[in-house]
Each structure stands twice: as C-alpha cells, then as structure tokens.
C-alpha cells in the first residue's frame, strides 16, 4: 500500500518550548480522511504540536521513505517549507497547499527539487486522492518541469460544493483536546468555508476568491458532528467554532442556540462579525442563554480612517455598541487588533 504523510508545517526553525496557542489542523484531517477512503495509507505529523524543527522534519522524511508527502504553507513560514522540500533526498511526490498558495505559487514554481511537486490552490480533499491514484481529470493551469499547479475552484469537479456531506475522521488529529482558558476540555469545528466579507488584509477576502462560493453547513450536519465528538470524547466540555460565518445573521443566531440546546453539557465559543450583531443586538442575550461563553471579534482598529482603508465594515461606534452588549449579557469578549 502506498504511504502518504501529511505535515502540519512548523512555525519555528528550531525546536522550541514556546507556548503558542494551538489549533488542530482540521484541513489536513479532511484530506487524510479522503485519502484513506481511496485506499491510501496516511498519517498526519503535527510539527507544531510535536515542536519539530525544520531539520527534524527533513530528516524524518528521508528516513521514513514515504511515497507521498503533503505540507501546508503560510506566508510566515515560507522559507521553512521551502527548505524542507528542497532538503528531501528520496524520490517521493510532494503536495503543497494552503490559503497563501494562490498568491505565491509563481515563487514555489522556482523551488529546487527533482521530485514532482503538486501545488494545490484551493481545497484538497477530493483532488489529492485523485492525483495519487492517477485518476485526476483536471489539467494543471501551470507547469514547470516537475511542478504542477492545480486550481480547485467552483468550476472544478473536485470542488467540495456541499460541505454538509464532507466527513472528518478525527482519529487522524490524534489527541486534539485542548484545555481552554476556562479549564474546560475543548474541541474545534468548522461550519462554513469561504467568506462573505472583503477585508483588505485577509487572504480569504471575497474579492480575492471570486471563483469560490461561500458554503454553509446545515444545522443537522453540525449537530451530527458534535454527537460524534461526544461519542468519541464524552468528557468534552466546550466546542470552539473557528469560522466567521457561524453567527452571520439573526437566523444563524437562532440556529446556533438550537444546536447547543441539544447539548446542555456543553458551552461554546465562536467568531462573530460586528455587522452580524449590530442589526440583531436584541439576540445577544439569547446567545448567553444558549451557553455561549466567549465571542471573538476582529476589531482591527478604532480609527475610522484606517478602518476605511482596510475595508473593515462597521463603524467604531458599532464595535463599542456590540462589545458593550456582549459584556453586559455575561459573555466574555476577545478582540483582535492589527498593529
């Protein structure tokens, strides 16, 4: 059986004991799930959680001799991932993906490697198994020597259109439970893909992703996933929703409360945009009653001039109004700022 190793790429060059905030690599988990469905032996090495150095990873690949490796890349660890790929001494097909790829793939095409390098722009859980099995019908949009660029957009047959039916086998994430700052055992989920907003600083901005549709999971699929989590980890106390669109309007707030009404043993935390609450301010109390413990808001700046420059919708007054309502209703608030 062919061996595929997926790497959650490191954020430091060397082994470190720094206690950075940790989130499970859910995207790699989805890819691993569908590689297994295709009959491919797959494992995930979480270089962040295991605190592996860049040299450790390259040596590990050369020692293990996998047939395929896949690794995600971010703007801040570009040079680290480049070093890993260029340090592979064995023959193996490589896959590289992540939100940043669409902006840097021309640079990746210049990397010095003799191995086949599949550069995936977009979501990879369907196209990667097809490439491994030699069954991919999609023609690469760019090619240089042994490097191939595949774009998975809404026109691709490998685009996950209905994400309510995309399954995640959480076994591949290992011990994904984290202790949040309330001392609760917590697991993270994603309930949407794509974004309806167009912030100038974000790689997921709508204007940069016109070829990708925003997709929302059904209430039933989210309930089913939480049931599966509790079946596997009955001592879980909190769910963290990582995407921005779980609380996107009044109707979705009602849906959130209905979902967690099924799980009275759980609290939950999630992201929310100021615009989602400013028009539904009366529903903030409902969120507290639905055991929402903490909300995360991208404030970015209190300067109206700067907010306009970065296309951050909602005014500073909106931020103040929403923040005050959240706190007065007993929900904790975490604000993100850009410096």
Please name every model-derived segment.
Residues 14-28:
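Glycine- and acidic-residue-enriched helix-capping/strand-helix junction motifs
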Residues 8, 45-48, 72, 206, ...:
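Residue-level recognition of beta-strand->loop/alpha-helix junctions
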Residues 10-12, 16, 136-191:
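N-terminal [4Fe-4S]-dependent radical SAM core
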Residues 31-159, 165:
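Glycine-rich beta-alpha loop elements in corrinoid/cobalamin-binding modules
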Residues 23, 164-334, 339:
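Radical SAM [4Fe-4S] cluster-binding motif and immediate context
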Residues 7, 97, 122, 336-338:
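Generic beta-sheet signal
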Residues 6, 71, 96, 241-243, ...:
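Conserved beta-strand positions
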Residues 1-5:
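Extreme N-terminal starter segment of soluble prokaryotic enzymes
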């Amino acid at each position: 059986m062919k061996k595929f190793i997926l790497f959650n790429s490191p954020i430091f060059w060397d082994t470190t004991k720094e206690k950075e905030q940790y989130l499970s690599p859910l995207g790699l988990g989805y890819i691993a799930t569908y590689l297994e469905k295709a009959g491919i032996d797959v494992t995930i090495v979480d270089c962040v959680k295991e605190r592996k150095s860049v040299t450790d990873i390259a040596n590990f690949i050369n020692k293990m001799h996998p047939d395929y490796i896949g690794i995600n890349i971010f703007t801040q660890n570009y040079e680290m991932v480049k070093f890993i790929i260029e340090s592979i001494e064995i023959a193996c097909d490589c896959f590289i993906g992540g939100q940043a790829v669409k902006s840097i793939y021309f640079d990746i095409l210049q990397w010095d490697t003799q191995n086949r390098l599949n550069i995936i722009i977009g979501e990879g859980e369907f196209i990667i198994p097809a490439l491994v099995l030699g069954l991919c019908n999609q023609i690469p949009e760019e090619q240089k020597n042994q490097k191939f660029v595949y774009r998975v957009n809404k026109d691709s047959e490998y685009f996950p259109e209905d994400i309510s039916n995309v399954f995640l086998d959480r076994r591949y994430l290992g011990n994904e439970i984290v202790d949040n700052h309330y001392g609760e055992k917590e697991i993270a989920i994603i309930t949407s893909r794509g974004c309806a907003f167009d912030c100038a600083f974000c790689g997921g901005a709508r204007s940069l992703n016109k070829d990708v549709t925003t997709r929302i999971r059904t209430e039933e699929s989210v309930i089913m996933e939480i049931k599966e989590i509790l079946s596997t980890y009955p001592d879980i106390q909190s769910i963290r929703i990582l995407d921005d669109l779980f609380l996107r309007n009044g109707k979705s707030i009602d849906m959130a409360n209905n979902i967690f009404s099924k799980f009275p043993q759980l609290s939950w935390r999630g992201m929310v945009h100021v615009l989602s609450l400013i028009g539904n301010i009366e529903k903030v109390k409902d969120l507290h009653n639905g055991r929402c413990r903490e909300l995360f808001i991208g404030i970015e700046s209190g300067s109206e001039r700067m907010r306009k420059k970065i296309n951050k919708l909602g005014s500073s007054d909106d931020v103040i109004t929403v923040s005050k309502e959240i706190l007065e209703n007993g929900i904790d608030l975490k604000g993100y700022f850009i410096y």
